Amino acid sequence: MKIQILCFTTLFLAIFTSQVTTAYKFKFDYFGNGTDPISFHGDAEYGPDTDGKSRSGAIALTRDNIPFSHGRAIFTTPITFKPNASALYPFKTSFTFSITPKTNPNQGHGLAFIVVPSNQNDAGSGLGYLSLLNRTNNGNPNNHLFAVEFDVFQDKSLGDMNDNHVGIDINSVDSVVSVKSGYWVMTRSGWLFKDLKLSSGDRYKAWIEYNNNYKVVSVTIGLAHLKKPNRPLIEAKFDLSKVIHEVMYTGFAGSMGRGVERHEIWDWTFQN
């Protein structure tokens, strides 16, 4: 396991004012030596390899042998997202993930990148709630939840558009915006959309960015072995300063349904 963590403070001085900016940056090339600053909640664990004994180098958010399994993996260090109560630092993250069905038909449900107020999983339940929320607190503005979901099961009661979509969740698993999974490529005749089946078992790369000046969230996905597509899959305007506290935690959550499906994170970078 190779991890690079950098925390630094830069002081900008002006004639009449000064501003302190705290930035946090880390990188995991893989997981599993037992010293990663990652805490597991629910059924999350270091992923098992194909032999069932050694570790795969990934984080597994669900377990094959537990029906309706769900869990979270959280970076243990709290991160400063705001210099004060109103402003919000820009941030960006990228990670490689895979969703692999082990039974047929595919029973879902998916995984999500999360920014949450606490390093625990007491509010999350399985199935379509993706270990993010539950039936009681879903939609509560006091959740202070930001998530980007990669959903592979259509739960119409939660507003899912289909069984293969990417969505932005704010305090609710009813996404404020969702689109069919895929990526854009530029051709001689213009932009061409290519579908990506999230539950194919293939490894995909996701890039999530927040521009604090324009208050824009962008989400891009693509094949893990290719470079980042030039056009985002989602680009939507949201003021996250009203959602995210000054100090928050970040990580991943996932859940499966009646069937067995493996939800894994293979590498991860974060910077604000």
UniProtKB/Swiss-Prot annotation:
Subcellular location: Secreted, Extracellular space, Apoplast
Signal peptide from the UniProt entry: 1-23
Gene Ontology cellular component annotations, sorted alphabetically: apoplast
Main location: secreted
Chain positions covered by the region annotation Legume-lectin like: 24-271
Modified residues annotated as Phosphoserine in this record: 241
One Pfam family recorded for the sequence: Lectin_legB
Highest taxon of source: Eukaryota
InterPro entries in alphabetical order: ConA-like_dom_sf, L-lectin, Legume_lectin_dom, Leguminous_Lectin
Keywords: Apoplast, Glycoprotein, Lectin, Phosphoprotein, Secreted, Signal
Molecular function (Gene Ontology), one example: carbohydrate binding
Carbohydrate-modified residues: 33, 84, 134
Family: Belongs to the leguminous lectin family.
Protein name: Lectin-like protein At1g53070
